[in-house]
């Protein structure tokens, strides 16, 4: 009997190289979030009427969830398909990063960054697992090296965006630019998945999350 929730991967007629390039774009967008706040803190503190020290909580909020979420995502990516999971988290990231540009208080921004970190934290480890699945062993090191280059460029872009674009456009518009990067990655990933994909079962996703975070008895 066929599985009620088949794992959806990119269509077989699609090139793995293009799939990996799109994952690198997603990784670029994810890593651009990591350092973007460094240069924006003075603007944020001034606009939200607080101190730079207090504003730094938004950096901590992102780092906490971005790192800790990686402890539980493996089983979920395996269950629902790594490529589709990355596409879903990219779409979620686009929305959450855009929300960061609309908040009016520091606690709201901290919560938005907390949620953004939880979404972005899925992208790179699941993408690297997918690359390992579809790449021949003798080429894996080379392909992973190219994929990681996208992450490094994303960090550099994020830091530059926080400084240069922050001065030119303001801190809120920087988040809208980064949300656009996530949206661009989402569009490419969804196209690569194909039109015959099925939506994930929300109840099944919730069960997998509970199983992942519940310690064994």
Residue ranges of predicted features:
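Paired small-residue
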Residues: 96, 107-115
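Helix-loop-helix hairpin linking two adjacent transmembrane segments in secondary transporters
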Residues: 108, 137, 146-191
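Conserved MFS/SLC helix-loop-helix module at the cytosolic interface between two early adjacent transmembrane helices
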Residues: 68-104
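Residue-level signature of mid-helix packing/kink "hotspots" within the transmembrane helices
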Residues: 35, 63-71, 155-156
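Helix-breaking motifs and short loop linkers at transmembrane-helix boundaries and internal kinks
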Residues: 49, 81, 102-108, 119
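Cytoplasmic helix-loop-helix junction between adjacent transmembrane helices
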Residues: 112-151
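Juxtamembrane intracellular "pre-TM" segments in multi-pass secondary transporters
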Residues: 5-14, 193-217
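Extracytoplasmic
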Residues: 19-52, 70-73
């Amino acid at each position: 009997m066929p599985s009620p929730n088949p794992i959806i991967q990119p269509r077989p007629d699609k090139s793995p190289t293009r799939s990996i390039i799109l994952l690198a774009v997603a990784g670029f967008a994810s890593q651009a979030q990591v350092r973007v706040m460094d240069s924006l803190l003075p603007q944020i503190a001034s606009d939200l009427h607080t101190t730079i020290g207090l504003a730094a909580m938004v950096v901590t909020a992102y780092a906490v969830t971005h790192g800790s979420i990686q402890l539980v995502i493996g089983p979920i990516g395996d269950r629902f398909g790594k490529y589709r999971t990355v596409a879903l988290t990219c779409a979620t990231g686009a929305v959450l990063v855009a929300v960061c540009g609309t908040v009016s208080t520091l606690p709201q921004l901290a919560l938005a960054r907390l949620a953004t970190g939880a979404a972005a934290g899925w992208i790179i480890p699941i993408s690297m697992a997918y690359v390992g699945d579809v790449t021949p062993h003798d080429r894996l090191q080379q392909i992973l090296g190219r994929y990681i280059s996208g992450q490094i460029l994303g960090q550099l872009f994020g830091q530059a965006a926080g400084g240069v674009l922050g001065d030119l456009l303001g801190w809120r518009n920087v988040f809208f630019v980064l949300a656009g990067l996530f949206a661009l990655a989402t569009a490419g990933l969804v196209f690569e998945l194909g039109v015959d994909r099925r939506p994930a079962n929300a109840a099944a996703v919730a069960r997998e999350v509970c199983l992942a975070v519940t310690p064994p008895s």
